[in-house]
């Protein structure tokens, strides 16, 4: 299906949120699955609210997720002359008309309709107006068909039909001459030869109006697929009050792009009972026809579970690159000693996010300045001094270099001292990390190296002496 062309068309009035990211992902996967083209278009016709900062945030979010585009980014503001040509075409063909109704008049009509129990819609006052004071402020409206219905077969929701009597004459050009959203979208999609429009179902009500415009302009009507919305745990539409919604916020909180992609694709789409999909598997198996009609509920616990999976199975060298900014935010400028990939291998099994991993990795780069005194108090000082002396002495003479060897060495120390492993392991873990919540002793010694391990034991002994 090489003629398949899809687009992601965000408005640059904020960041890339998870709902928009899922829409982008579905479009990207559909294009990649069928060998089609994925286009990025920035819908910046709202010049008052659109910002370059928002554009940058959207591009940054998509790049982080790995959603590369084949064409674009295109900007709607570059096409204003083209939109005006199409407005004039409709005027010339009698398919659009000028409207001089003032906002207060329209509001009065809306209130009257509501009071009478009618659906508010423009009543066509200027549709057949003979006098046309062109020097007065006016908008331009599309002359929509008044009879019959406008229907389409949605790939997700099935057939949807709208009685034309319920659709009013859409404004396509404002009083200042700028085109409106629904009009620009139709022109762009038509000229970009978009074959499939995959977007959120909050656009369903726009679709019949856009179909009428396609037909009036003589353009082919694309195939539509409207994706159900994402809800919070309270079944309300996902928003900031449910937690982070920005893609970049999830990056900064320590989530991996593959985890977020995997989670987003499962918000509405399924492939049997499978939960974990690699990028390649998503491309191979995704089909918009398998997206459900019901809204999806955002579950942070499921995202955490997926993120933990990708951290646990991730390449330590790659994770090291991703972890460095999180350590830098904690004052660690140099992650070379100990080797960060080696450190990560001791933490992968237990961390759900990179932020959590960075917090747990901190002791490797910053020797503890204080110790868990409550945990140390469970052992008398003579015992602690004996353990620290025995371990330091054996480490000074050892040629061990790997965690299993250090674990064996500790067992020998326990046997020689007549101690149980917890009576050696816990004090040593506190001496090296400051806490009882740390990886295995052998792993810590391997990552820190023998010299740094001995130095930390000596500092702990000095702490006990005071």
From Swiss-Prot:
<dbReference type="InterPro" id="IPR020058">
    <property type="entry name" value="Glu/Gln-tRNA-synth_Ib_cat-dom"/>
</dbReference>
<feature type="binding site">
    <location>
        <position position="101"/>
    </location>
    <ligand>
        <name>Zn(2+)</name>
    </ligand>
</feature>
<dbReference type="InterPro" id="IPR000924">
    <property type="entry name" value="Glu/Gln-tRNA-synth"/>
</dbReference>
<comment type="subunit">
    <text>Monomer.</text>
</comment>
<feature type="binding site">
    <location>
        <position position="128"/>
    </location>
    <ligand>
        <name>Zn(2+)</name>
    </ligand>
</feature>
<keyword id="KW-0479">Metal-binding</keyword>
<dbReference type="InterPro" id="IPR020751">
    <property type="entry name" value="aa-tRNA-synth_I_codon-bd_sub2"/>
</dbReference>
<dbReference type="GO" id="GO:0004818">
    <property type="term" value="F:glutamate-tRNA ligase activity"/>
</dbReference>
<dbReference type="InterPro" id="IPR033910">
    <property type="entry name" value="GluRS_core"/>
</dbReference>
<dbReference type="GO" id="GO:0008270">
    <property type="term" value="F:zinc ion binding"/>
</dbReference>
<feature type="binding site">
    <location>
        <position position="99"/>
    </location>
    <ligand>
        <name>Zn(2+)</name>
    </ligand>
</feature>
<dbReference type="InterPro" id="IPR014729">
    <property type="entry name" value="Rossmann-like_a/b/a_fold"/>
</dbReference>
<keyword id="KW-0963">Cytoplasm</keyword>
<keyword id="KW-0547">Nucleotide-binding</keyword>
<feature type="short sequence motif" description="'HIGH' region">
    <location>
        <begin position="10"/>
        <end position="20"/>
    </location>
</feature>
<feature type="binding site">
    <location>
        <position position="240"/>
    </location>
    <ligand>
        <name>ATP</name>
    </ligand>
</feature>
<dbReference type="Pfam" id="PF19269">
    <property type="entry name" value="Anticodon_2"/>
</dbReference>
<protein>
    <recommendedName>
        <fullName>Glutamate--tRNA ligase</fullName>
        <ecNumber>6.1.1.17</ecNumber>
    </recommendedName>
</protein>
<keyword id="KW-0862">Zinc</keyword>
<dbReference type="InterPro" id="IPR049940">
    <property type="entry name" value="GluQ/Sye"/>
</dbReference>
<dbReference type="GO" id="GO:0000049">
    <property type="term" value="F:tRNA binding"/>
</dbReference>
<feature type="short sequence motif" description="'KMSKS' region">
    <location>
        <begin position="237"/>
        <end position="241"/>
    </location>
</feature>
<comment type="function">
    <text>Catalyzes the attachment of glutamate to tRNA(Glu) in a two-step reaction: glutamate is first activated by ATP to form Glu-AMP and then transferred to the acceptor end of tRNA(Glu).</text>
</comment>
<keyword id="KW-0030">Aminoacyl-tRNA synthetase</keyword>
<keyword id="KW-0436">Ligase</keyword>
<dbReference type="InterPro" id="IPR001412">
    <property type="entry name" value="aa-tRNA-synth_I_CS"/>
</dbReference>
<dbReference type="InterPro" id="IPR004527">
    <property type="entry name" value="Glu-tRNA-ligase_bac/mito"/>
</dbReference>
<keyword id="KW-0067">ATP-binding</keyword>
<dbReference type="Pfam" id="PF00749">
    <property type="entry name" value="tRNA-synt_1c"/>
</dbReference>
<dbReference type="GO" id="GO:0005524">
    <property type="term" value="F:ATP binding"/>
</dbReference>
<feature type="binding site">
    <location>
        <position position="126"/>
    </location>
    <ligand>
        <name>Zn(2+)</name>
    </ligand>
</feature>
<keyword id="KW-0648">Protein biosynthesis</keyword>
<dbReference type="InterPro" id="IPR045462">
    <property type="entry name" value="aa-tRNA-synth_I_cd-bd"/>
</dbReference>
<comment type="similarity">
    <text>Belongs to the class-I aminoacyl-tRNA synthetase family. Glutamate--tRNA ligase type 1 subfamily.</text>
</comment>
<dbReference type="GO" id="GO:0006424">
    <property type="term" value="P:glutamyl-tRNA aminoacylation"/>
</dbReference>
<dbReference type="InterPro" id="IPR008925">
    <property type="entry name" value="aa_tRNA-synth_I_cd-bd_sf"/>
</dbReference>
<dbReference type="GO" id="GO:0005829">
    <property type="term" value="C:cytosol"/>
</dbReference>
